[in-house]
């Protein structure tokens, strides 16, 4: 309206015309009769009949696959041994159950519509299913939110630990509040799903839309309600308008969860990387890249303008860009390795722990053993905890790191305790090492020298004298002590006390192994022996030392007299051999040793931090893959939701996005189970695997289970159900060579599916089953390669003909004894044990593993040889019976004749027959059922241990008798 007396406002008229056009365009939205009756705007969720059929089939298929995967995942979770479970597994089960419920609800609606299409127009039907759908989806979102909160607390509140009464483990995170998880997960989604019925009785007014398609074949009532749920193509959910329904009740919380997951992960990433850099800065930079960069800068600047441009381009563009790309890669791959950090610990020129030394000069604590395995091995890997090898320096890293959990062991009991990085502990330990190895003005005292004696740190000796020729053969203290006896020229503070020198006038002191009691005993008993400077030296070094000593004895002089030009003229200034220079060089050697000690302990601390960081990275990859997979699952539904605001209302749905959206919505359960199986590997936590581990730890010192224990297990209640069985008995019943064709077929079918489950690319049906001699040698830990048949030798004959000669009465008697000892497992339990995670324990295989592991492990104790041989000189003619090998079940019945013999044989089975000691004092008792080394056997015949030694070995194997 134009007011009289005032000129018309052209801008206002133009704005009003544009607004009217916009309103007209909204009123001209195309729609269908079904959308108008349901209250759906425009062309939202408008499909043809074939498209609807395809979408519903996709939804049913994806939901069914997800349900099957959920059942499989719950089976593996339920069959994990309770000793191996931690709170994380409870959260995984909680997440799988929520996603399982969501997949089940999403499958109900399309199935009912395909069965009875008329219920599509029933408001009670789609409102009820819509409430359950919203409840299940929001419950799954709440579960992943709780998952993220739990791991955020583990990182930022590592001291929140509580004892798990069920397993005895220390649990963190939300473990103390675990009783609130299920109520919150049920209550919050129920409230959100119920709020959708606000304004349910309020009707939508879409009378101005243009109907272009009449598809009301379902007799919908003419009452488009604003609140409630709407039937979509393959599911029932919240209405797209008003927007607050889906934003407040569904997508808003979901976007918040996604942002929260990214924020938690980003904060953890920044926290760990910053702490790693701070620790590295506190304990020192081991790469020494600053000096190299300065040299490179001077070199490039010397090339003129082109060199300067190259340096600026590399410093301010290339390197920052590469650093950014590496950080992005590390962020998305959950890696905490510094892009500028060298990952090679081998001690190369660019290695992290290189201090200008060659690889041969790396300290022992950074080296691996001769077998190639790390010295820090868990007890389950053998008797490493009792390893005391005098030929090898002690590994100080074991003691310096004793307060920290074993980061290399994949132990489920520790997996949640190792995702925190405590820099204060690492730095404090490094400071403790500095204090412990502080050098006073007088030099290192005896105790410090003793501690340093365990490490093979190199010291660059700058003495240019004939003394240096003995440095590689004898300790410097050997020569200086003898010189001191001659003229008192050299005074070395690192020598032993005068009392020790007076008691051992002709002995050379071994400073590198001052803790070795055996060397002290040898010095007391043999006054004219020259101890080797390093027990790891070869025989040539020993021969050289003996030759030197022989020369000393022949000349009847002190070893110092054999040194060329060792006279007063030798120490004149012209010869650069003054007493002060020798003392100064010795002090510099000690200071150099101390510097190396400090650097090596710094490197050790940093290496420990790197191990912990690697464990954190591994565990974070295991736990954050669930939230990240959640984000990946909701990627296409988010795209589909974004298209609904404008594009779908005007033009209808984008079909390829809708297909993917319909497929991935129910697949959360499938993804959770795949991640769980891939990362957790629950088949390694079955009862059989866990019980086998505990049995190995129990019998590892004994070296075998023993026939008595095997039969005891087999005849127990669990053994009668097949949880404990003997491989010998099972192999003898092999169906591969049975005369019954049906049994042969079933054997091949069972072998096929077994290899299929193990994901073997090459199927092999060859087996030595039913070969009596082969399996007897195999389970006795003997070399059975000579007895192994080839496939060309196999013939389909009777099992008794293949295994036993028909004319052998002895073997036939053994077969009868085996049959009498066998335990018949019911058919039901035999079928059960073919199911994954429900297998039994092969006691024969476990016994064989114990024997092999015991033979390959170093087993020695401090002073064990001395305890075994302390009375050897008094009992040289005492013979010990060597017939104490435990017989297998094939021969046990032929040995026992009466009660007295039974008790004697049982006593023999509890003791070892002999104990052989090698040069480095490693005692290796003969394992029953194995063939001893003929060389060791000959040595034992000439030098057998006394009865007290055998009692000690028996005690170590079986405990107090």
UniProtKB/Swiss-Prot annotation:
- Would you kindly state one Gene Ontology biological process term found in this protein's UniProt entry? detection of sucrose stimulus
Q: What topology in the membrane does the UniProt record assign?
A: Multi-pass membrane protein
Q: Where is the composition biased (Low complexity)?
A: 502-558
Q: What Pfam families does this protein's entry cite?
A: Git3, GPR_Gpa2_C
The cellular location(s) given in this protein's UniProt record come to:
Cell membrane
**Does Nucleotide-binding count among this protein's keywords?**
no
Q: TM spans, by residue?
A: 57-79, 92-114, 134-156, 179-198, 251-273, 620-642, 823-843
One Gene Ontology term of the molecular function aspect: G protein-coupled receptor activity
Q: Pull one GO CC term from this UniProt entry.
A: plasma membrane
According to the record, the residues making up region (Disordered) are 468-568, 783-805
Q: Which family does it belong to?
A: Belongs to the G-protein coupled receptor GPR1/git3 family.
Biological role: Seems to associate with GPA2 and act as G protein-coupled receptor that senses glucose and controls filamentous growth. It acts upstream of adenylate cyclase and is required for glucose activation of cAMP synthesis in concert with a glucose phosphorylation-dependent mechanism.
Name of this chain's protein = G protein-coupled receptor GPR1
**Which species does the entry assign this protein to?**
Saccharomyces cerevisiae (strain ATCC 204508 / S288c) (Baker's yeast)
